[in-house]
């Protein structure tokens, strides 16, 4: 797909008014498929502009993401065993989830980490945390959707990086894109197995988590083996 995209028909070109009818005829395009606009199709360059100019007096004061005071000590497993945690991005930071992955990697009672990945940030701390967990003996499974539009090559590169670190990589379904944002951490707890689950509306992307409005819920379920009386 990445190679084919370089050879497909163009979707935008800069031409004079005189060339418009000729090009339309040569390409066999009906009028309804030809749009004339002065707006660039790709506006990603706008994201770099604030750093190029002095915007003093033109912007609001920066509001840093709020921190959860209850999590300052960093014992996420103990906290989530007693409380659910709902993060409202970008007003709160995605860092607690990233820290949870690193805590899972270092916790000897954690058995596995399973996660679905769609769009990751460049130099992704989440991908680094998953690789770190696999390198520290955790079973890490990543369902990585390669067909995230315009992020295909990035996802291919991340799949190789994660696989080299020891993660098990799955590539989703043939007919459908996997947009689900789910993470499941399995951990041995006194009395049974604890399932720490994260479900959210936004990608596992630390950069867009500072811009897009999303919700991220972290919760925990303790599963205890049924006693003989319970199985009757």
Region spans (language model):
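N-terminal non-catalytic structural scaffold regions of very large proteins
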Residues: 4-112, 127-129
